[in-house]
């Protein structure tokens, strides 16, 4: 575990402070990123990309900027934001093997409109 805030932010940030920059690059509608997954409910999402791992890392770095990150081996990173939101990135998900970012707002004091969701980054002809 390093010291300071993710991305060398000078301040401990909440998820709501990162929505605008993240949503300028990734589809964001009604508190959810990406598209509805054909195999899940509204909280299971997917973003299609020609380089799904690089896209997942970019998304995670933007949405978790300014949080406190802990690394767990080579597969998982967990970031706690100032508002209590927990953002987890796994390089390989347990369900389908794709990279996944989980946004958990259960303990958030101010999620800034973001809803609880799990986003799978799927290899394809996306951006």
Please tell me what each predicted stretch does.
Residues 72-94:
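Amphipathic, interaction-prone secondary-structure segments
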Residues 93-96, 107:
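Solvent-exposed loop/turn segments at secondary-structure junctions
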Residues 76, 97-104:
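Histidine-centered divalent-metal-coordination microenvironment in nucleic-acid enzymes
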């Amino acid at each position: 575990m390093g010291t300071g805030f993710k991305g060398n932010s000078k301040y401990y940030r909440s998820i709501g402070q990162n929505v605008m920059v993240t949503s300028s690059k990734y589809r964001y509608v009604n508190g959810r990123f990406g598209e509805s997954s054909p195999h899940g409910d509204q909280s299971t999402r997917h973003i299609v990309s020609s380089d799904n791992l690089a896209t997942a890392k970019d998304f995670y770095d933007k949405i978790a900027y300014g949080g406190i990150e802990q690394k767990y081996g080579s597969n998982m990173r967990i970031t706690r934001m100032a508002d209590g939101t927990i953002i987890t990135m796994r390089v390989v998900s347990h369900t389908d093997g794709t990279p996944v970012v989980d946004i958990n707002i259960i303990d958030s004091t101010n999620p800034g409109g973001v809803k609880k969701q799990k986003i799978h980054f799927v290899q394809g002809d996306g951006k």
